[in-house]
From Swiss-Prot:
<comment type="subunit">
    <text>The complex is composed of two ATP-binding proteins (ModC), two transmembrane proteins (ModB) and a solute-binding protein (ModA).</text>
</comment>
<dbReference type="GO" id="GO:0015689">
    <property type="term" value="P:molybdate ion transport"/>
</dbReference>
<keyword id="KW-0826">Tungsten</keyword>
<keyword id="KW-0479">Metal-binding</keyword>
<keyword id="KW-0813">Transport</keyword>
<feature type="binding site">
    <location>
        <position position="168"/>
    </location>
    <ligand>
        <name>molybdate</name>
    </ligand>
</feature>
<dbReference type="InterPro" id="IPR050682">
    <property type="entry name" value="ModA/WtpA"/>
</dbReference>
<dbReference type="InterPro" id="IPR005950">
    <property type="entry name" value="ModA"/>
</dbReference>
<dbReference type="Pfam" id="PF13531">
    <property type="entry name" value="SBP_bac_11"/>
</dbReference>
<comment type="function">
    <text>Part of the ABC transporter complex ModABC involved in the transport of molybdenum into the cell. Binds tungstate and molybdate. Can also bind chromate, with lower affinity. Plays an essential role in recruitment of molybdate for nitrate reduction.</text>
</comment>
<feature type="binding site">
    <location>
        <position position="60"/>
    </location>
    <ligand>
        <name>molybdate</name>
    </ligand>
</feature>
<keyword id="KW-0574">Periplasm</keyword>
<feature type="signal peptide">
    <location>
        <begin position="1"/>
        <end position="23"/>
    </location>
</feature>
<keyword id="KW-0500">Molybdenum</keyword>
<comment type="similarity">
    <text>Belongs to the bacterial solute-binding protein ModA family.</text>
</comment>
<dbReference type="GO" id="GO:0030973">
    <property type="term" value="F:molybdate ion binding"/>
</dbReference>
<dbReference type="InterPro" id="IPR044084">
    <property type="entry name" value="AvModA-like_subst-bd"/>
</dbReference>
Length: 251
């Protein structure tokens, strides 16, 4: 035993050194709606691959501008499919890397139980002062919210009540803090264990807005980064898929 122990320790050390040598860090721009899922995925990704994931969260439109201005992101998880496609057309993306990692769900939510009914009729009642949405110019969930209000014929009525967050996280914060009685949020922000975790919500029917297809790409700065390729592969795997679905997304 005394002669085998040093050999075992050396083998473990060699394995650790080998893993560290092959490990990389990947800088990821993450659409705000995907904050909780990517945090859960990152833990498993880092444990399973040895790579490190460093995430920044924000609005898709703002990330587009930052990427065009040379931001050091290597992977982009967008809240739509049009922005990654545009970056691809403009030569900012590793060819063939674009894919849909999730299909988002829009929800009308209030932290107050019973406030939002199952059919969204509360929107027609107008019995509230403020309705929160994400900026429709930069945030796909905000655009989906405006499309839904248009389809319902409520855009003119609800317009004066709108408060806009820079992204879907800020739209959620306006509601959770009480600055708005209700708001359009990503289902992933309020969903846990297969149900709405707190308050009351209406899942907005998909026919009221364009599909929220969320695409990912490897950006040119991640072309030679092993961690960037590993992350994209991981997002396509069964473990990530299960986590993504657990937050209310479709695949």
């Amino acid at each position: 035993m005394t002669t085998r122990l040093p050999q075992l320790l050396l083998a473990l050390l060699a394995s650790a050194v080998s893993l560290a040598a092959s490990a990389d860090e990947v800088q990821v721009a993450v659409a705000a709606n995907f904050t909780a899922p990517i945090q859960a995925i990152a833990k498993e990704f880092e444990k399973d691959t040895g790579h490190r994931l460093v995430a920044a969260y924000g609005a898709t439109g703002q990330f587009y501008t930052q990427i065009k201005n040379g931001a050091p992101f290597q992977v982009f998880l967008s809240a739509d499919d049009s922005t990654p496609a545009k970056l691809e057309q403009e030569g900012e993306v590793v060819p063939g890397s674009r894919f849909t990692y999730a299909i988002g769900t829009l929800a009308l939510w209030s932290p107050k139980a019973g406030y939002v009914d199952a059919e969204g009729e509360v929107l027609k009642s107008g019995s509230f002062r403020h309705l929160s949405i994400a900026n429709p110019k930069t945030a796909p969930y905000g655009l989906a919210a405006t499309q839904a209000m248009d389809k319902l014929g409520l855009a003119a009525t609800l317009g004066p009540k709108l408060v806009e967050g820079q992204n879907i996280s800020q739209a959620y914060q306006f509601v959770s803090s009480g600055n708005a009685e209700l708001g359009f949020v990503a289902l992933s922000q309020i969903y846990k264990d297969g149900k709405v975790a707190t308050g009351s919500a209406w899942i907005v029917p998909t026919e009221l807005h364009d599909p929220i297809r969320q695409d990912a790409v490897i950006l040119n700065k991640g072309k030679d980064n092993a961690a960037a390729k590993a992350l994209v592969d991981y997002l396509k795997g069964a473990k990530a898929a299960a986590l993504i679905k657990s937050y209310g997304y479709e695949l």
